[in-house]
């Protein structure tokens, strides 16, 4: 290096550990329409000022590192750095704050949830200056969301494909989740679909195990689909789980499903990964397959209130990465989900424009600029007595999925499906007539049971079943 170059490079450089606040805490910054905005719930270590902690989050999730480096002078940090532009204390909590960070759009690769998450929720979550950190929400600007595939088809196209309108769709996860042979599995699928369900589902655990290889399962399920369609005159579907150990194997399974004439495949998007999910979404769009998404592993990431990623962020990421359905919890069943929080991210999945509403945990106004919506799937510990509440909470654009609530019927699988179909149609009719499902729900089910022995038997079996636990994640 020449002396002249050494002198020029040394101008303005001061080695040492950074005070993040000096560069990355910018309370006067006015956010741009193209910025990606993040709301972090942060718990600093004792003695760490919230401004320093928020600035550290902005730095470590964008251009910063722990010390000043020579190469800072070779780029424009003001153009590329994240900025902590606001900090507010969390009501009722000691030493806990919401830090708002703005990221310039050029930090992220177009159409890549993988790159987005690698930056925003990467190493910063292990930062020693923070006792805990949780990403509560993201604002995705239209300039960025338009670079993503989004759902392969969306709600309206799915309705048109199925020719089913004006009610929630009904599903069932085949149980036991592991251990059935392919032929017995196909039999259960046929009985449920013949009884009146719209969909049946592979459990997320079912891939290709020694007791049931994927190709055998696909073949027997396809036979069940065509037989039930011929008998009922309705279009039926089964979520064939294409999740596999490699992307190549996953796509091979999706190709086989399409060749069999199946209308929908499934993917475990968190365990499978966003890159695999987006690849599958592209295939599904190009080949007319619907894509059902299971969220296995989500509670490891989102259930703790102070650390991790809220599911509303994972839901937004899925809408961008691609999926036509995603599991969202039930509010009333066995799985975690408070009503207002759940409806907040359900709207973020389905609607085109969602206003900021802190009462539902929505930190930013989100404009999806006509990106297709995703059907929320309510699944987990639900049965016929829950039908009025589920219909009232989730509305028509949803899938209500009863596994044990179908297959646990005392008379068998088909009567279990009949009970659920009668219950949902009774609830929809009552709602359309102006009745209040929240207050009259049990009466509506009892009235319908007088004309359906299958529903009456289901009501008797599950009349005492409740899951009354407080939600861990609350506002």
From Swiss-Prot:
- Record: residues binding Mg(2+): 201, 203-204
UniProt site (Transition state stabilizer): 334
Question: Which GO biological process annotations does it have?
Answer: photorespiration; reductive pentose-phosphate cycle
GO molecular function terms attached to this record: magnesium ion binding; monooxygenase activity; ribulose-bisphosphate carboxylase activity
Q: Where is the active site?
A: 175, 294
The coenzyme or cofactor needed here is: Mg(2+)
In its record, the post-translational modification comment is:
The disulfide bond which can form in the large chain dimeric partners within the hexadecamer appears to be associated with oxidative stress and protein turnover.
Class in the EC hierarchy, top level: lyase
What residues does substrate bind to?
A: 123, 173, 177, 295, 327, 379
Add the further remark from the entry. Answer: The basic functional RuBisCO is composed of a large chain homodimer in a 'head-to-tail' conformation. In form I RuBisCO this homodimer is arranged in a barrel-like tetramer with the small subunits forming a tetrameric 'cap' on each end of the 'barrel'.
What family name appears in the similarity comment? Belongs to the RuBisCO large chain family. Type I subfamily.
Assembly information from the UniProt record: Heterohexadecamer of 8 large chains and 8 small chains; disulfide-linked. The disulfide link is formed within the large subunit homodimers.
Q: Please give the function described in this protein's UniProt entry.
A: RuBisCO catalyzes two reactions: the carboxylation of D-ribulose 1,5-bisphosphate, the primary event in carbon dioxide fixation, as well as the oxidative fragmentation of the pentose substrate in the photorespiration process. Both reactions occur simultaneously and in competition at the same active site.
Q: What is this protein called?
A: Ribulose bisphosphate carboxylase large chain
Coding gene? rbcL
